[in-house]
């Protein structure tokens, strides 16, 4: 008769199951727990359970030990009030320490806008740009043939001008300092308004059809029209325009300057996205990934040469290009028409506005393009978007003739001075 091996079993722990085995058991049979707890909550629960059942060092070895248990065992010591035996808490001191650790608060997103303004006669036209929030904290909006200004500080609304029934506003854009406003019209003429005097100080001609896109670069105003032409207007010169460029084959609906690089991005109804260097009249890059009109364009304020763009109804994609290398960095199907976009000034995130079917405002993490939040309140496609000067809020305008204000971002922390006082 042969010898039989009998494993050594600790009296206080007859079977030493590893925490990993226990965890698999809980996850396979605890379907109700999974439904009620998710993500961070479930992970914290499993960590607490591990601490209580197996101590601070949960074993991940095999399920049974054949031999001496080498895990740390509480050493015999003199009886003191600090002993676990005398604790009034149902959990161990180690678990208490874990629960006392500060938790990062979960980011909350608004379910509803904090302000809604009526915008009668706000055009439901994908190609126009009728909304801009300037550095002076004044919002400019084009409603039919009129320009209105809304002060975020006082809440006061004033009508700046009415062009008459035959000439509607097609685009508005503040200068960098917010002291002058450029207004594009159906007639192809661009008007420059001085806000302090509330007078038009200049009119710029050159387009034969409506001007839907505007972009400032210091003293130069770039405009794009339905005539497929891009014009650079140097406001320091008495003449009309300094340069004309024509490569788009349909209406130009998106323009954005990256002032740090001196690069201009232009998008059009021909589904093309061009990047220009300010020193050349020929495009630096031509990106053809989109299959619908490219109106939504935005340069990253955090990384040089990173350009985001969004396509229309057929395309629905959000793309990221690196204009320093000329390569496509990322592409994502958002599921609906991308009408407009803006980069957060305080975090590496992108806000996009959308059309059918949800008419939502979406927030994406860069560079993964992971969807962070979706805000739904508009009842028609969200065509217009602008960000507040402090970067905390956005305003959206839609075909439902409303302007809605959302607080999405925290204020940018002040950089500590390195000067020795």
Swiss-Prot record:
Cellular component, GO, one term: anaphase-promoting complex
Biological classification of the source: Eukaryota, Fungi, Dikarya, Ascomycota, Taphrinomycotina
Subcellular location, record wording: Nucleus
Electron transport found in the keyword field: no
Described purpose of this protein according to its UniProt entry: Meiosis-specific activator of the anaphase promoting complex/cyclosome (APC/C). Involved in cdc13 degradation.
Protein keywords: Meiosis, Nucleus, Repeat, Sporulation, WD repeat
Protein name: Meiotic fizzy-related protein 1
Residues spanning the signal sequence: none
Amino acid composition bias (Polar residues), ranges on this chain: 86-98
Region annotation Disordered: where it falls in the sequence: 79-107
Domain of life: Eukaryota
A Pfam family assignment: WD40_CDC20-Fz
Main localisation: nucleus
Mapped WD repeat ranges: 123-160, 164-203, 206-246, 247-286, 289-331, 333-374, 377-416
InterPro entries given in the database record: Cdc20/Fizzy, WD40/YVTN_repeat-like_dom_sf, WD40_CDC20-Fz, WD40_repeat_dom_sf, WD40_rpt
The protein's assembly and partners: Interacts with mes1.
Organism field: Schizosaccharomyces pombe (strain 972 / ATCC 24843) (Fission yeast)
Family affiliation: Belongs to the WD repeat CDC20/Fizzy family.
MF term (GO), any: anaphase-promoting complex binding
BP-aspect Gene Ontology terms: anaphase-promoting complex-dependent catabolic process; metaphase/anaphase transition of meiosis II; positive regulation of anaphase-promoting complex-dependent catabolic process; positive regulation of ascospore formation; positive regulation of meiotic cell cycle; sporulation resulting in formation of a cellular spore
SMART domains in the record: WD40
